[in-house]
Amino acid sequence: MQTACSGNLCGYQLMFSLSTVVTVCRSLRSRNRHWFLKLLGVRLTIAMRCALENISNVAKNNVQAAAKKEIKQKRGMTKSKATSSLQSVIGLHVEPVEKVQSPEPMDMSEVSNALEAFSQNILEMGVDDIDKDDHENPQLCSEYVNDIYLYMRHLEREFKVRTDYMAMQEITERMRTILIDWLVQVHLRFHLLQETLFLTIQILDRYLEGASVSKTKLQLVGVTSMLIAAYEEMYAEIGDFVYITDNAYSKAQIRAMECNILRKLDFNLGKPLCIHFLRRCSKAGGVDGHKHTLSKYIMELTLXEYSFVKYDXEIAAAALLSTRFWDEDMEWTKSLVHYSAYSEGHLGPIVQKMAVLSQQSHPSPNSRLDQEEDMASSKFMSDQQATQELKSIR
C-alpha cells in the first residue's frame, strides 16, 4: 500500500486544494501522512501540550513571536519637532529651596487679651460690645465678626449696581415693578425663604445692568433668577417654573438663560443682602422681634421701587430707623452708628422715601401692622393680576 501510494504521488505533479489535502491525509496512516505532506512542501509543526502545567488551549507560534521580537529591535526612536530643540538639563546649577517653617500654634490667651482690649476701646467710645457674650458659641465667630462685615461691605461696593442702567434697556421701570410683583407671588407659592426673594431681585438687577433684555424675555430672566437664588434644602423643580409661567418658556430656554446669567455675573453670587446688615443693626439696637419683622417688611416694599437700587446696606439701617414712626422711644444710639456705619443725618432722606412708600401702600398703616396677609395683599398684586400684566408686556 505504501509503495503503490508513493508511486502514484511521484508520477503526477498535481495541485491540490486544501480540502483535497485534508481528505487525503485523513485516509492515510500516520507514517504515510507525514511522508505525503513532505512531498507537498508543507512544514508540519506540532505544538506539544503538557498535561497539567499548560492549561491554555491556544497554541503558541514561536516563529511569529521571534519575528515580532526582531521587528521591535530594529525599530528606532525618532524625535518630534517639539522635542528635537530641547536641551539636556543634566549638569545645570539648581539653587536650593529654602524650607518653609510651619507656623507656631497661636496662644489663645493672646486672642483673649486682644478681644478684651477691643472691648475696652469701644466702651471708652460709648459703644456697647454686642459680641462679648458670644465667645462661647463658635458658630457666631465673635473673634472675626467685625472683619467679616468689613469684607461684606467691600463686596457690596464691588458689585454695586448702576442707578441709570434702565436708560439703556428696552424695558421700563413699570415693567420691572410688574415683574417683581409677580415674582413675589411665585415666592409665596413655592414657600421659599426670605433671603431667596432678596437674592432674586439682586441677580435680576445685576443682569439687567450688563445685558440687553427684550420685553419678551423679561419674565424668563426673572423666573431664572429665582431658580438660581433658590439654593435651599427644599426647592422647586424647573418644571414647576415652566408651569408657573403658563408654559410661556420651555425647560431648555430656562437652562440656557441660567447659563447666560451665570456667565454674565462671572459666577459671583456672593453680594451681601440688606437683610444680613439688618440682623447686625437689630442686634446693636437691642430691638425686639416686632420691630425687626417690621423693618424686614419695609425693606420688602423697596424691592419693586427702582429708585432704591442705588442703596445697599443703607436700606437695612434706614428701615430700622423708620420704625421710630411707630415707636417714638427708638433712638439712633452711638452703638447703632458704630455698627451700621451710618449716622442719623445720612439716613434721613432714605427714611423719608420709605415713609412716603409706606403711606402709598397703606393709607392707615397703624390699623394693619399686625396683619401680615393684609399688608402683603395691599402692596403686591394678586397672582392672576400679575400674570395678566406680564402677558400684556410680552
Curated annotation (Swiss-Prot):
GO terms (BP aspect): cell division
Keywords, alphabetical: Cell cycle, Cell division, Cyclin, Mitosis
Intrachain disulfide bonds: none
Keyword Signal among UniProt keywords: no
InterPro entries: Cyclin, Cyclin-like_dom, Cyclin-like_sf, Cyclin_C-dom, Cyclin_N, Cyclins_cyclin-box
Region annotated Disordered, chain positions: 360-394
Bias (Polar residues): 379-394
Transmembrane parts of this sequence: none
Superkingdom classification of source: Eukaryota
SUPFAM superfamilies named in the record: Cyclin-like (SSF47954)
Record Pfam families: Cyclin_C, Cyclin_N
Assembly information from the UniProt record: Interacts with the CDK1 protein kinase to form a serine/threonine kinase holoenzyme complex also known as maturation promoting factor (MPF). The cyclin subunit imparts substrate specificity to the complex.
The protein's role, per its UniProt record: Essential for the control of the cell cycle at the G2/M (mitosis) transition.
Family per record: Belongs to the cyclin family. Cyclin AB subfamily.
Protein's UniProt name: G2/mitotic-specific cyclin-B
Source organism of this protein record: Patiria pectinifera
